[in-house]
Amino acid sequence: MQKYISEARLLLALAIPVILAQIAQTAMGFVDTVMAGGYSATDMAAVAIGTSIWLPAILFGHGLLLALTPVIAQLNGSGRRERIAHQVRQGFWLAGFVSVLIMLVLWNAGYIIRSMQNIDPALADKAVGYLRALLWGAPGYLFFQVARNQCEGLAKTKPGMVMGFIGLLVNIPVNYIFIYGHFGMPELGGVGCGVATAAVYWVMFLAMVSYIKRARSMRDIRNEKGTAKPDPAVMKRLIQLGLPIALALFFEVTLFAVVALLVSPLGIVDVAGHQIALNFSSLMFVLPMSLAAAVTIRVGYRLGQGSTLDAQTAARTGLMVGVCMATLTAIFTVSLREQIALLYNDNPEVVTLAAHLMLLAAVYQISDSIQVIGSGILRGYKDTRSIFYITFTAYWVLGLPSGYILALTDLVVEPMGPAGFWIGFIIGLTSAAIMMMLRMRFLQRLPSAIILQRAAR
């Protein structure tokens, strides 16, 4: 029992800074929306539309680079720190190549925006302008993620938290300058949010690099000599590990986007209630997602040390802590669902629907916690392909079709509206949780030599 308590303390010490960093990141998006809304409703809508395209694109790159964390954690645990610098350099090359692709996609996103049904031309122009300003921040964001993943792979999660809050503090005044045109800058409205956010991502990257260059704990890595040229073999391995994670993230984000589109014809009350419940459950998701990042680090580190039993302990502890957290957040959601809904909207119909959907959200919080922490465990074992297959099957083969049938057809019951999609979420997330656990048990039952060989790839 003592070993689980000790492991839980280590996991929470790693996870809490990640939680705070994620809160800072979420707050940046909130600040952009509020400040653009203060300028005009059209500008706020433009930022929302632009963000809905930016997120899937940048999260694809983000997911690809998540492969670095278990690689570095495993090298750190095995005492092969002299190889870390080379992996990080290749991570920067990969981030650079992916940035170019993302920037090309975002530059041409106007075709998608202008093809939206009944979109106002002025709104479309502002959304395109926002994206074309924001896309210059894509390299800065991905370079920052490489540096952050280096730190987190070495069990240093506080720097990412600090840089996140630096970014938030810089974002507010820079937004103000470019939205309203102060200090000689042009008045850009919502487009100014894109300029400001792009600049902030570069500030965060440069601040993180400054920390890494000064950190005593990374002196040996910093001083390691090696080629700065692209290494196709290393980059191929990073892509093999990272691409399934990137695709899983992409399909998860697009799932919720598709559901939002399917709910939109049902009416304002249904759309508003669905959005409130989804926004709140997204905030609660920060907790298990951050714990999953910590579990990846601990499992990778223990496997690097050659201890499959300690890796199992880290995995089981992560799941136990995650279930405890999810139970508490579910109780909180059920107890205060109406008060939470009132923070978003005071329309009685919207509040009633949102409160009902939050009950369903509370049901799936435990499944959601298990599946996301399970994904973190599998990343630690470098078993990333299974994450993609499980996520795609659970969300797109089981969850979305079930939700569609329940919400919009009478094949099983009378059309349930948004609640049907939320039951679909429960089916999808519960299926993902079960499959993640089965895969984890399969891996952990392999001979230790095979587990360690797979982890050392």
UniProtKB/Swiss-Prot annotation:
InterPro entries: MATE_fam (IPR002528), MATE_MdtK (IPR050222), MdtK-like (IPR048279), Multidrug-R_MdtK (IPR022913). Keywords: Antiport, Cell inner membrane, Cell membrane, Ion transport, Membrane, Sodium, Sodium transport, Transmembrane, Transmembrane helix, Transport. GO terms for molecular function: antiporter activity; xenobiotic transmembrane transporter activity. Its main location: membrane. The keyword Transport applies. Signal peptide: none annotated. It is a multi-pass membrane protein. Residues 1-10, 74-92, 148-159, 210-242, 297-313, 371-386, 439-457 are cytoplasmic. One of its GO terms (biological process) is sodium ion transport. Residues 32-52, 114-126, 181-188, 264-275, 335-349, 408-417 are periplasmic. The chain crosses the membrane at residues 11-31, 53-73, 93-113, 127-147, 160-180, 189-209, 243-263, 276-296, 314-334, 350-370, 387-407, 418-438. GO terms for cellular component: plasma membrane. Disulfide bonds: none annotated. Multidrug efflux pump that functions probably as a Na(+)/drug antiporter. Belongs to the multi antimicrobial extrusion (MATE) (TC 2.A.66.1) family. MdtK subfamily. This is Multidrug resistance protein MdtK. It comes from Escherichia coli O1:K1 / APEC. The gene is mdtK.
